[in-house]
Amino acid sequence: MDIFSEFLNCLSSDGTLNESSIYKTYQILESLNPKDVDTKENYIKLSNTFSTLGSGVGFQDNLLIEMFKILTVLFFKTRSTDLGDLLIESFTSLEIEKLMRVKKTIGSIVLTKGIQELQEIELPKVGFNCMTYDESIFQGISLERLILQLMSIFIAKCEENKLWLVNNRKDLDLRVIGQRLLHRDFACRFLSGLFISRFSVSGDTDESKHQNGIRLQLFIDFSKFETRLTMQILKADRIFSTCVANTVHAYEGLFSSGSNIDSTIATLVLEPRDLIVYRKGFALLQIPWTSVTTIDKIKKVKSLKIITEVSSLDEFVFQCKDGDKFDELFSTSEEIMNKLLPAIIVSPKLTLRNRSIIQIKEGESKLPNTSKQASQNLPHLDDELAYQRFEDQVIDKSVCDDECTNTENTPSSNIPADVKDSLSADDYAYDTKRKTQIEDLEEDQNKSKIASKDGTNLKEINSVPEFSDENVINQTGPAKKTPVQRRKDGKFAKSTKRKKQKSLKPDTENQESSVKNKKAKSNVNLQYSPKTPICKINDETLKPPTIANIAGHKQMNHLTSENIETPVPVPNGNWYNGVKHETATDIFTTCHDGNNSLKSSVWKELLKEKHWKQESKPQLTGNSRQIDLSTFVKQANTPNITSLLDGTCSSPPNNECFNDKEPDSSSSTLISDRQELEYRNPNAETVKLEEIPYNKFFKTVEKNEAYNPSSKSATIDGLQRYTSMIGNQIYEGILQNEKELRSKLEAYHINCNKVIKEFSKRQTARYKIIEKELAQIEVNLVSQIDSLMFK
């Protein structure tokens, strides 16, 4: 122990480390007591040294290799997850040449000790439906993750280590790695499959398949699997899909973070101590539940916004693909968080201490009984997907913290099974605290208002979610819930408002007047209403709503508190300018309504009302939506983008368009009507416009009378249909231009971020080199001054 203490003192005091002292320290490591080594002070000294050891500056190659040997032995000796993380971080930060040199030198030590540790660790005897881990079980799972991850790093692109492991297969039990394919933990299953797949031979020939089968037998006992495994199944994408098939709480959807504008296809897996996000072409994201601070539910787009304390990922949004599983996803995550956090009692006087709260606006949602039996069969998957980027990437190093409390050892574990099922998550986990909390609640219910430090009064709370009165719940009218807000005195308050429903009576007067006045009825038909037939806009170019970079975007049109359950802005994207897809009416309509439409004049109404000069938005009729093209501007990420429709309706139509006559005395605007007439009368070869009475289409104009389009114009059948087609093309052009601008902006931001990151890396490396050189110069100056003083 004295030699090891001297070694640590040299590290902390920047003393000279020679090869002999390092070699002596390495020799006595096996005889040390793990409890004496695994202390906070020793970890601080080691982390300060190995955090700068990754740059490799100031260390020779032989000393660098010996230092990593010492850290490797310390990790397997103490089984400390902190030392394991330090080993992986410092090793992966080395330069490529030094990394490969260290990998080839100490690879045999890492593989030998890793397999020996996996032999001693037993698989947890818990089922796939279990969503709680004992602390000892979780410590073993965390250690297995680190060992498999470290072994996978030393195998990647290193044929020497692969050959050494195969040659020593008789001394090492390689099948302990294949046993992890049946592990309860998702990450262990994924890492074991990734490790085995690195031994595969590329190619589709019979010889390559034969070699893959032989190598697969080294790691897997086929008698424990009902289906035949192949190397192709254990590839990165394929093994992930196989692991998801054996996972109960796995959900597919779209993932987007604050730094990424576009959403990527991802799969979210809920584990008892952490949640895992997998995106094709990226490394796994492992986020411990203890670092999750807030979960907001967006019911409108079936999404969850999760805010974390992880520095690299402050927040992200996951949109569930299957709407039926969204409630299960939300309730499962709520149940897991309730087991990790202390009980929350919602009362008129809220005092919540010591931990952060999940702000959930969807009321009390319980975990549905939708758990399925885990399938032991590995399913046959589709064609193998190309996966190149994942070869050098392994599971993310941000594994679960150890701050989780042991919920299975609570006194409530003695409750019978039938009673547990009837209790909620909070009642089940915190049954022993109810008596004191109910007493405090009875005292607090006598107070109707709470005064904060600044003198402001909170509104009266009419209902309590956990201790509610039936008379309060049965009140008429929907309850408008406000989110949990923090007061200035550091406490929380929650209020509930109720609005009485207004009695809606049918507007019989307007209906009678519209029936009596035929002209008014024709005007009503021109407006937008749910009964008006609409022409569908082509949805092929429109994407579904995506959860993109929503910071800085404007709020959507007609966004109310009823459409969204949490104070989260709805993502902006190519989605009808933020309008709900289910209830959004199209921009253009047609007014084919029998004989009534024939008696009205479209041009008359257009010239009379002059929609192109109106600055205010038109009035809405009922629940319909009306958009004026002259003021319509598509929202976009880039500001100050003018609409392409400005100027298209700047002036009314000229009279010349009505006076241009063809030889058959028909207006040039009625050419499309001829085609419709020919289509409607298939028996006649050609239908001339003179053969049809004029009173069906337009009124007779006297020869000596001047033509006044405002009073006597033709009612054109199908005009709105062609107008809508033109508008649709304009709208699609706007969307296409916006896509191009957005893609250019995204590429520009990505390039800027890359340049900034590379510059910061270069600067930090330069500063480290300068600091080391200054330290050496200082030491030399001090030594020279001492020598001069002695002389």
From Swiss-Prot:
Report the main location listed first in the record. nucleus
Q: Which GO terms describe its cellular component?
A: chromatin; linear element; nucleus
- Impact of mutating residue 309 to A? Decreases interaction with rec15. Decreases meiotic gene conversion at ade6. Decreases spore viability
Q: Where, subcellularly, is it found?
A: Nucleus; Chromosome
Polar residues composition bias: residue spans: 644-657
Could you tell me which residues belong to the region Disordered? 462-523, 644-672
Keywords carried by this UniProt record:
Chromosome, Meiosis, Nucleus
Give the Basic residues compositional bias ranges: 493-503
User: Which BP terms does GO give this entry?
Assistant: meiotic DNA double-strand break formation; reciprocal meiotic recombination
Segments carrying motif Nuclear localization signal: 485-492
Q: Does the keyword Nucleus feature in the UniProt annotation?
A: yes
Q: What's this protein's name?
A: Linear element protein rec10
Q: Which gene is transcribed and translated to give this protein?
A: rec10
